[in-house]
Regions:
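Structured beta-strand-rich core segments of catalytic domains in phosphoester-bond hydrolases
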Residues: 1-72
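Metal-dependent phosphoester-hydrolase catalytic domains
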Residues: 54, 107-118, 124-190
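A solvent-exposed, charged loop/short amphipathic helix patch at secondary-structure junctions
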Residues: 72-92
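Glycine-rich, phosphate-binding/catalytic loops in enzymes
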Residues: 2-5, 41, 79-80, 134-139
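Active-site metal-binding loops of divalent metal-dependent hydrolases
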Residues: 67, 122-123
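Sec-exported extracytoplasmic/periplasmic mature domains
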Residues: 2-6, 29, 103-110, 128
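Extracytoplasmic/periplasmic, Sec-exported soluble proteins
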Residues: 12-16, 41-43, 86-93, 172
């Protein structure tokens, strides 16, 4: 498929199930890390990946991800799921996945704010930056995933930055759960 549009290189991020993330490129892709977690407390349910592409003397770090989609936490027995939902277990689990992914990728660089990094995928989470459209309480756990990214990484939400007064759904409904982040040097090149 990638060859149809001139891409002869393919990369598949880490995945534990049938939901992998795939990127294609005209340039060789180096696998930096396939991320699935390292135990019950840090399982990345649908996986993530860190790939690197070098071109024209530049180095582009690409992080792909797909976090847990349910309202209850991952690994919860069926009979305990309603309790987990009531405690916002899914939001808290996704936040753990985001922290783990960031620590395994962009946090590995001591100079990420000056490098080309992008992170994209199905976050299955809403962002506080869209709350003017949601009008949710400021203390909702629904924002935990993106709060972590905004507070602990140099990533910029590309869509929100480019179109600050607009809202773009990614679900066909009234939510945005798919995001594209990048660092400032890459953002300036867009």
């Amino acid at each position: 498929l990638a060859a149809r549009y001139g891409h002869k290189y393919i990369y598949m991020g880490g995945h534990r199930d049938d939901y992998p993330q795939v990127i294609t490129s005209r340039f060789p892709i180096e696998n930096m890390k396939r991320i699935t977690g390292n135990g019950q407390d840090s399982i990345v349910t649908h996986g993530a990946g860190w790939a690197r592409i070098r071109f024209n003397g530049k180095q582009l770090n690409i992080v792909t991800l797909h976090t847990w989609p349910q309202r209850y936490s991952f690994g919860i027995p069926k009979e305990e799921r309603e309790v987990s939902k009531a405690a916002n277990g899914g939001d808290k689990y996704r936040r753990m996945e985001m922290e783990y992914i960031c620590k395994e990728t962009i946090a590995q660089s001591g100079n990420a704010q000056n490098e080309y990094w992008m992170m994209m995928g199905d976050f299955n989470a809403k962002s506080r930056s869209d709350n003017s459209f949601y009008n949710w309480p400021e203390d909702t756990t629904a924002f935990l995933v993106h709060d972590y990214s905004h507070q602990n990484t140099p990533y910029i939400d590309v869509i929100k930055e480019k179109y600050p007064n607009e809202f773009f759904t990614t679900t066909g409904g009234k939510t945005r759960i798919d995001f594209f982040y990048c660092t400032e040097p890459l953002y300036k090149a867009i």
